[in-house]
């Protein structure tokens, strides 16, 4: 049986993985179009994790991301990379490293003093902000469909309604928000989708950080009893 050029599958935490078995953008485009026409209701503004395959070493990942966005498919990160070359390709493209499937290495914090990127406004839908080698501070909301990421910490002095990633590229970081109702969160390669966020922390001010192979949540304000 011939292997599908484009395949979607669900993974842990209800995540959706996109696997590509071609290095030709034109072939991928045709396959995506065919796949979406077969189930149009499923592929409406979905966020996916791109599973790295050998074919992708020959693909311009930025062009691939733009191609997917033409079909309202948003790549939020890349998993299953296996070597330094693949890691560099992903980092150069501006996509987040979300680790290798089922493999997590212990991340130990190191003393550091990162610069800070500050945004003094709301982050609108479809807007992407990435703070490379720095922390990110947002004085406003991260709207649905927006994406913010930082190699360090992400501080949101407003509502987190879109997607946020801290500790990108296997760094240490935390997400701080005054109101959690995110579409997707990731810290140091650990991630959760909206449907799997702990109910008790939703619509609350929280800190989110990685602890071994899980995401941990702490209230920023003491709960009234």
Curated annotation (Swiss-Prot):
Entry annotated with the keyword Cell cycle: yes
Presence of the UniProt keyword Methyltransferase in the record: no
Keywords for this protein: Cell cycle, Cell division, Septation
InterPro entries xrefs: CAP/MinC_C, MinC, MinC_C_sf, MinC_N, Septum_form_inhib_MinC_C
Gene3D superfamilies membership: 2.160.20.70, 3.30.70.260
GO terms, biological process: cell morphogenesis; division septum assembly; regulation of cell division; regulation of cell septum assembly
Signal peptide: none
Function: Cell division inhibitor that blocks the formation of polar Z ring septums. Rapidly oscillates between the poles of the cell to destabilize FtsZ filaments that have formed before they mature into polar Z rings. Prevents FtsZ polymerization.
Family the entry assigns: Belongs to the MinC family.
Protein name: Probable septum site-determining protein MinC
Origin species: Pasteurella multocida (strain Pm70)
Designated gene of the protein: minC
């Amino acid at each position: 049986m011939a292997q599908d050029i484009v395949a979607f599958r669900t993974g842990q935490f209800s995540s959706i993985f996109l696997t590509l078995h071609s290095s030709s953008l034109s072939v991928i485009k045709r396959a995506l179009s065919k796949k979406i026409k077969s189930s149009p209701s499923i592929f409406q503004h979905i966020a996916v994790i791109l599973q790295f395959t050998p074919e992708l070493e020959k693909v311009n990942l930025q062009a691939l991301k733009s191609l997917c966005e033409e079909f309202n498919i948003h790549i939020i990160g890349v998993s299953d990379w296996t070597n330094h070359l693949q890691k560099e390709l992903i980092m150069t493209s501006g996509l987040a490293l979300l680790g290798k499937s089922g493999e997590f290495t212990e991340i130990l914090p190191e003393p550091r003093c990162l610069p800070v990127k500050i945004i003094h406004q709301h982050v609108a839908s479809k807007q992407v902000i990435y703070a490379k080698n720095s922390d990110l501070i947002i004085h406003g909301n991260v709207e649905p469909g927006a994406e913010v990421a930082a190699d360090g910490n992400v501080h949101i002095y407003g509502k987190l309604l879109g997607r946020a990633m801290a500790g990108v590229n296997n760094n240490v970081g935390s997400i701080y928000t005054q109101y959690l109702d995110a579409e997707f969160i990731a810290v140091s390669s650990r991630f959760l989708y909206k449907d799997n966020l702990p109910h008790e922390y939703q619509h609350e001010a929280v800190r989110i950080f990685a602890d071994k192979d899980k995401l941990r949540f702490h209230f920023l304000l003491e709960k009234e009893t």
